[in-house]
């Protein structure tokens, strides 16, 4: 349950695809990540970092999908989730869409992000949390 909504992907669904040699991409939160960590599923984890908390709030408002109360809850949850970002294999800053997209594709295809980019993303993350 996230933001009072229930989300999930059936383990069976993932297993069926993996057994057929099909890679599965899941858009999950930190709770989902921690559940996958407890399984034997071979995975790569990518944490998408917002440019700032203010920018995240601005983007949520611009979407126009949630009330201000829900947005406030989402922002507070994001602050907590950011504390877990360094547990993920990679961190990608979602400041420039095209660049973030290229980094994610590189991680998926090559299984790596340049160490320099990841160090920069970790610094941005730590600055945001301080």
Q: Which role fits each region the language model picked out?
A:
Residues 1-24, 30-34:
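ATP-dependent small-molecule kinase phosphotransfer cores
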Residues 6-10, 29-32, 52, 56, ...:
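Helical mechanochemical/support elements of P-loop NTPase systems and associated helical scaffolds
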Residues 13, 77, 103-107:
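Alpha-helical elements of Rossmann-like donor-binding domains used by nucleotide-donor carbohydrate transfer enzymes
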Residues 16-19, 38-41, 83-85:
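Conserved catalytic network of the ASCE P-loop NTPase/AAA+ motor domain
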Residues 24-29, 38-63, 94:
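Conserved phosphate-donor/acceptor-positioning beta-strand/loop module used by diverse small-molecule
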Residues 43, 53-55, 61-83, 98-99:
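Ras-like small GTPase catalytic G-domain
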Residues 62-66, 83-130:
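NTP-dependent small-molecule kinase module
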């Amino acid at each position: 349950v996230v933001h009072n909504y229930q989300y999930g992907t059936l383990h069976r669904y993932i297993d069926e695809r993996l057994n057929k040699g099909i890679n599965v991409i899941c858009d999950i939160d930190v709770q989902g990540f921690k559940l996958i960590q407890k399984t034997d599923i071979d995975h790569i984890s990518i944490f998408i970092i917002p440019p700032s908390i203010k920018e995240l709030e601005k983007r949520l408002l611009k979407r126009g999908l949630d009330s201000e109360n829900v947005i406030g809850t989402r922002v507070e949850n994001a602050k907590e989730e950011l504390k877990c970002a360094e547990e993920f294999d990679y961190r990608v800053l979602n400041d420039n869409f095209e660049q973030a997209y290229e980094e994610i594709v590189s991680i998926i295809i090559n299984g790596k992000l340049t160490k320099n980019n990841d160090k920069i993303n970790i610094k941005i993350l730590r600055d945001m949390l301080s």
